[in-house]
Amino acid sequence: MVDKCLFKLSDQFPEHTAGFHVDLGLKPYGSYNSSKWSPVRFNRVLTNVGNGYDQKTGVFTAPFSGLYIFHLHFIGGLHKQKTELAIFAGGEAMAVAYADGYDVDTNDQGACTAVVDLVMGEKASVKIYFGNPLLWASNLVSFSGVLIHSD
């Protein structure tokens, strides 16, 4: 009876786990400049289960095939210019976040989420999609991803 219960319980958890959470660091002021179409290299890695995120390149490589969820949050719109960042996966923009600084202050927030089916070895990253490449360089700019179901 105990063996049956343990077997059923083990079926409830995925065989593979992978996830990461990265940001642009703890420095409260300053800016991060990235060229358009180049991955943003998040310099502080808070979590990297499965070692899929490469801090040197800013690219996540899927360690397992399956369904992933990615989330991006950023402060942009510096100097009253709009900024668009995109979550790229499998070679295309899956979600785009927008921020501008046209309101009272000169900063704005953008966020987006993408649910993507990746094959082991496929890549995901954040890239400047349009506009001003300056980002607020702090822990307020973050990117994360989690394997929610493995194939």
Language-model regions, residue ranges each:
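Extracellular jelly-roll beta-sandwich "head" domains, especially the C-terminal globular C1q domain
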Residues: 1-151
